């Protein structure tokens, strides 16, 4: 399997770079981002579940995403965080696997074969049976996001 590291210019559709930024929306995003970073800094000693519930999920919720913490899977496994179209939908659009910063289980651009990637692939296979709306899988250490 081969992975290609893309920069922001290659990843985003050129349309979005040309689109006018609405100041009010930018201010909301900036405020949410500052609160997210403050929560991360004050919670460095906490575990992944705490960081997902008290930093990442509130950040995404402030940006109007419908988040679900610890979505149950077959067996004992749980998706750390997921995003759906609405709060009652079982159709997940985004799966998020979180690892603590500097975790050996986290993916990097030089070390792709990691536990974080294996878990997201497992969750994808389990979800595709009943959910056809999955669009993205995100692996994060709360500072870096691999899509």
List PLM regions with ranges:
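A short, conserved, highly charged catalytic patch centered on acidic carboxylates
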Residues: 1-136, 144
């Amino acid at each position: 399997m081969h992975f290609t590291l893309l920069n922001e210019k290659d990843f985003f559709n050129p349309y979005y770079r040309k689109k006018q930024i609405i100041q009010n929306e930018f201010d909301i995003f900036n405020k949410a981002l500052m609160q997210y970073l403050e929560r991360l800094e004050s919670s460095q000693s906490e575990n992944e579940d705490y960081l997902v519930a008290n930093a990442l999920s509130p950040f995404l919720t402030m940006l109007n995403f419908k988040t679900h913490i610890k979505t149950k899977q077959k067996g004992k496994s749980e998706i750390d965080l997921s995003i759906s179209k609405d709060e009652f939908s079982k159709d997940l659009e985004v799966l998020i696997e979180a690892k603590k910063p500097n975790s050996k289980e986290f993916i990097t651009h030089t070390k792709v074969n990691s536990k974080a990637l294996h878990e997201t692939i497992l969750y994808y296979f389990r979800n595709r049976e009943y959910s056809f709306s999955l669009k993205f899988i995100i692996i994060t250490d709360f500072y870096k996001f691999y899509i």
